[in-house]
Amino acid sequence: MAKAATPKETAAAKKPAAPKKAASAKTVVAATGAVGRVTQVIGAVVDVAFEEGQLPQILNALETDNNGNRLVLEVAQHLGENSVRTIAMDSTEGLVRGQKVADTGGPIAVPVGKETLGRIMNVIGEPVDEAGPLKTSARRAIHQEAPAYVDQSTEAQILVTGIKVVDLLAPYAKGGKIGLFGGAGVGKTVLIMELINNVAKAHGGYSVFAGVGERTREGNDLYHEMIESGVNKHGGGEGSKAALVYGQMNEPPGARARVALTGLTVAEQFRDEGQDVLFFVDNIFRFTQAGSEVSALLGRIPSAVGYQPTLATDMGQMQERITTTTKGSITSVQAIYVPADDLTDPAPATSFAHLDATTVLSRSIAEKGIYPAVDPLDSTSRMLDPMIVGEEHYEVSRKVQSTLQRYKALQDIIAILGMDELSEEDKIAVARARKIERFLSQPFFVAEVFTGSPGKLVALEDTIKGFKGLVNGEYDHLPEAAFYMVGSIEEAVEKAKKLAAEAA
């Protein structure tokens, strides 16, 4: 099976097309008339001097030819009267002082619309899947204003994911912003892939996936999985449902700091056309990290923990654009890496304020072998309200949380004195909590290759019914092992019968 090209390979493949690139740069020069020259290159930051009166605006895209490849620079600062400091969207190797740079007269603009479905683009909207050019003339600037308050929709509706722990304890809002928080290796990407599998496939509308500073291998795997599962057709075409925008780990910080905006711009276009869009981002932390990398090169004084002083502004400008309007909705699922498992780190802490639901993945739960390793006490959602989810759902979820909280409070006593020292009531609560913990695990479709167990999608009614029975003591007679890695409560009962038969 042919592998999707990495942006670097595609750049190398494009070298023969040098004359075409140079010609496009000339047309830009003719359009705006402003031509500058490179005066200094420091890593991803390039200084360009212009003639007096021709200074480009902040966030304008500048173009130059770097050994046959189109290199886009984005204006970040004005230095004095006729010089600008820019951030490069690709490698600056090979750039020389005195080289001509053309002002395009506007921000970076990327292709949008149905023609992007089934294709992989990079930060500047160039296709990187070796399937030919994008057949669309519709373009949209990656820097946009957030929708006005009067245009925003306030309707509250649940997005059912088929994942028990999410649907019961921290349900997602349709048209809301969802954050998946976790340290390294606790399952953020697997969970986001499962959500793509469960939600994007069942969802009739379009999806946009932005790969921000993550592994190229994972992006490649996702591309091929989407083709194999029928979500996309190779090279786009009729029937494709998802657009992919990648700026992976090997890209310079300029690309990683802007690729989330490119993906969001594609999603905004679908929303404004009246679609309900799913927007997946893996990983928002890399967006912040890339901003931090270029911030120091731009000469800004670092803030707390070495982050850029503009951290909250950068995050706010992007997150405020991800919203549901009266035309259509964007439901956003964002994986957020938590450095050293510290949720108080400025990068994840800044994200919390913008989210409707937070799913916190915990290393202590992953260590028990319970996957998805969602922390049932740390995860929150504004949707968990009896007015939205209904009285029964609300009551069951709160009972589950109080049982787990009680078990957590008793763990020190159990560790020191043992289970025998607990009261009968506490013993029952601990036994139920341990069953609930195991019943919150679930085999995933995307993890079938690792676990060998077929994936399970559980309806919300079945989830509520199962946990209601557990907290009310209806399944106290079943062994703990019966609840591990099953879907509905009926499967747990069946598993208990099998275990009893094997033991007999």
Swiss-Prot record:
EC code: 7.1.2.2
Pfam families, alphabetized: ATP-synt_ab (PF00006), ATP-synt_ab_N (PF02874), ATP-synt_VA_C (PF22919)
Reaction catalyzed: ATP + H2O + 4 H(+)(in) = ADP + phosphate + 5 H(+)(out)
GO MF entries: ATP binding; ATP hydrolysis activity; proton-transporting ATP synthase activity, rotational mechanism
Region spans: Disordered: 1-23
Enzyme class: translocase
GO CC aspect terms: plasma membrane; proton-transporting ATP synthase complex
Annotated positions binding ATP: G182, G183, A184, G185, V186, G187, K188, T189
Membrane topology: Peripheral membrane protein
Keywords, sorted A to Z: ATP synthesis, ATP-binding, Cell inner membrane, Cell membrane, CF(1), Hydrogen ion transport, Ion transport, Membrane, Nucleotide-binding, Translocase, Transport
Location in the cell: Cell inner membrane
Top-level taxon of the source organism: Bacteria
Family of the protein in this entry: Belongs to the ATPase alpha/beta chains family.
The protein's assembly and partners: F-type ATPases have 2 components, CF(1) - the catalytic core - and CF(0) - the membrane proton channel. CF(1) has five subunits: alpha(3), beta(3), gamma(1), delta(1), epsilon(1). CF(0) has three main subunits: a(1), b(2) and c(9-12). The alpha and beta chains form an alternating ring which encloses part of the gamma chain. CF(1) is attached to CF(0) by a central stalk formed by the gamma and epsilon chains, while a peripheral stalk is formed by the delta and b chains.
Protein's job: Produces ATP from ADP in the presence of a proton gradient across the membrane. The catalytic sites are hosted primarily by the beta subunits.
Protein name: ATP synthase subunit beta
